[in-house]
């Protein structure tokens, strides 16, 4: 498949917390859609090894959710570091989207971009500087059409691949209910 500048890169990171100065990335997943939001490619879903000290520093919320999902065990067992995760992810993306063409797509991608900028700069540089943030649309719908919110429920698994799939489904829902284009 030839890379297409109209395709969209969807990304989600799971982190040990919300502060890039102290927390680390522990999982990354990517999907590519065409401009109509049809999934055309699934990238690698990678648990990124972090030390026991990094994992032990997680707050209770992260310990609970990442423990229950099995992510902490996957991170401990992983032999993949951040540089390897970046290389594998970019190798996947190059098949579908030229460098610099796609905005960063997902939910609260500003947070993901902060971590990419700190720990995975080469991957952050692969994206256009713009964001396609589903959480922005959600906040607008919540204020301007609150009745529409009841029609879409997220599972909130806090697993990177499932979170991206939900983000795409959520934008598809808003497109069908809110946007008349």
From Swiss-Prot:
The reply on keyword Cell division is no
Keyword list, A-Z: Cytoplasm, Exonuclease, Hydrolase, Nuclease
Any GO CC annotation of this UniProt entry: cytoplasm
> Which residues carry out catalysis?
129
GO molecular function annotations of the record: 3'-5'-RNA exonuclease activity; nucleic acid binding
Q: Which GO terms describe its biological process?
A: DNA metabolic process
EC number in record: 3.1.15.-
The domain of life for this entry's organism is: Bacteria
Give compartment(s): Cytoplasm
Please list the disulfide bridges. Answer: none
Domain Exonuclease residues, every copy:
8-171
Q: What is its main location?
A: cytoplasm
Summarize the protein's role: 3'-to-5' exoribonuclease specific for small oligoribonucleotides.
Q: What's the family?
A: Belongs to the oligoribonuclease family.
NCBIfam families of this UniProt entry?
PRK05359.1 (NF003765)
Q: What is this protein called?
A: Oligoribonuclease
Please report the organism this UniProt entry assigns to the protein: Shewanella sp. (strain ANA-3)
